[in-house]
Amino acid sequence: MGKGTLKKFVITVIILEILIGAIYYGYKKLGTSSDGTSNLSLKDKIVTTLYKKIAHEDLEILDVMENKAMLYYAYWNIDDKETINCEVVDVKEDGYTCDGLVTFVKKNDLEKAVKNLYGKDITVQVESFEVDKKHYAVYDETHKGVVVFSKEDNSSPINIKLKSAVKDEDKILLKTQILDGIYGTVKETYQYTFVKNGKDYYLTKKEKVKA
């Protein structure tokens, strides 16, 4: 290879590197707004993992750090729930019934789920709480866990839809829409804030925002 040819080759490589760098930078800028935040794909692995933690919502809870709210979210993030026979349950709850085998969640499992969702330093007092409009988790001190009672309720369930995901430094913000069960119209729009601590993201906040 002659000196002239070598020089042209080197120049070509440099130009290609500059072009590739410019394309990459431009691509990154497309997903980054002027305030430094960047949009994430709704199919992003972290986004889908975090959304799964709050996608079961069937109650209009706003203060996610409130004790009963933490238990509610923890309950829906426990995949392997046990059952218990209502005949051995000592507690009762007005308006709710317990018959045959029903869902039972140990106190320790709820506490563990709270830490997985909110952070290792978060503590919770296990008590009775609403699971959804038709079910109530009643704490049974004898069996050290909650027993899920049920009741009749004809109201439509709340449908939740993920609208957007944004990364803001050490935070990931998920914006969701609450849809009318019949017409599918947007009733409310909420934003969930997950803050990174170590390798994991933990739920810290929920607020009403504009659509």
Sequence positions of predicted segments:
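Mature, Sec-exported extracytoplasmic domains of Gram-positive
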Residues: K29-A211
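N-terminal Sec-pathway targeting helices
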Residues: M1-I18, G26
